[in-house]
Amino acid sequence: MSPIDRRRVAQNFGRAAARYDQLSQLQREAREELLDRLTPLQLKPDRILDIGAGTGHGARELKRRFPRAEVVAIDLALPMLEQARRQQGWFRPFRRVVADAAALPLADASVDLIFSNLCVQWCPDLRQTFAEWGRVLRPGALALFSSFGLDSLQQLRQSWAAVDAHPHLIDFLHIQQIGDAALKAGLSNPVLDRDLLQRRTPDALTLMRELKQLGAGNAASERARGLTGKRALAKMQA
């Protein structure tokens, strides 16, 4: 496993904030599927956290669905939340808090629903993150999240493996590892399933550039420093 540099994660997404909404098609699809999971549930939450809220689209929809709830958008990158503030409007505002998913500035048992779309894969210690969620959740509350899985970006990973041994992507977890982390953290009755979302790009280099523009670039703490040369890029695409 390649350790994750959380400071690098915050920097990458902060730089991507202004253009994030133009490029985040996969994130939108995953968010809509996650929101659909809420539809059949008869929830009446008083406080909702959107962890890894980005530019706030999930928080806005949660506020629309639960207008009486306090919705708190949490993200590690301040520029993302600044974009959320510009876009949220005045009619159904939500709070914005810069915080780590594994160190929430909230009291114990103070949250009814945690919503988190494609965030937990950026957490260095998933068990610690889930334990923190369990701390702030009230008894019987719900955490609903999505994550990239073990098979995500495998073709790009294989392309880089032909170039060198340095980590160019963070390692994603198998669904069983995610479930085990939830159980070990003390979360009750975890239910996980797997969906396949496909995104086609002309070549590996195009995909790599899109990931970087999204803020989803290399955040492995053991990544190679410095620029990638033209020869390495050509070999990666071969």
Label each region the model flagged.
Residues L26-P45, E61:
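Conserved alpha-helix/loop element of class I SAM-dependent methyltransferases that forms part
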Residues D112-D125:
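A short SAM/SAH-binding and catalytic strip from SAM-dependent methyltransferases
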Residues L142-T206, E210-K230:
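Conserved catalytic/acceptor-binding region of the Class I
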Residues S2-E32:
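Class I SAM-dependent methyltransferase Rossmann-like catalytic core
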Residues R47-L104:
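Class I SAM-dependent methyltransferase SAM/SAH-binding core
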Residues A102-L113:
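A short acidic, Gly/Pro-enriched loop at the edge of an enzyme's catalytic core
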Residues R127-P139:
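A short glycine-rich, Lys/Arg-flanked "PGG" loop and its adjoining helix->strand segment in the class I
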